[in-house]
Amino acid sequence: MALPDATTPFTRRSARIGGITALVGAVGVLAGCALPYATITYGTDDPTHPSVFNSGFGGNTLFAAEPLAVVMFSFVAAVILLTPTRPILQSVAAGMLIAFGIQTFVFFFGYIGLGTYSDSSFKGSIGIGTIIGMLAGLCVLAGGLIALIARSRPAGSPSAESVTPGAPG
């Protein structure tokens, strides 16, 4: 059974909720990049507080391109969900948000290893940017899931289980 092109108020509202959730996540990704992802102490030196935007190491600022692309594309996908448009575009936008949400969560999750690593000359601890970035990735993911689940529900039915296949005609 094909999904109808007409959207229901539930679908429009869910797409808006998904879009707003994704926008909150995109702002959170920016905050996660600006705040320190770890506190690192080398030997007896003063601790450093690197962030994605200010790593403190030459040439590493190019790593900021990845989360900035996520913010830009998440913003575009969220706007698609917030505006009345073709259902296929909203489904594609929801899929993009799901992919970017997973990728962003894993991106910031990787900084946990740096933050928790310690040996005789290196001490690390997790920074607030890591936590905010991971939560922001989950917000982007949730925005896409909310919109996609709403798109997959047939019009007029409370749940997908109540749909019965139509007789061949």
Annotated model-derived regions:
Residues A2-G169:
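Compact integral membrane and secretory-pathway proteins
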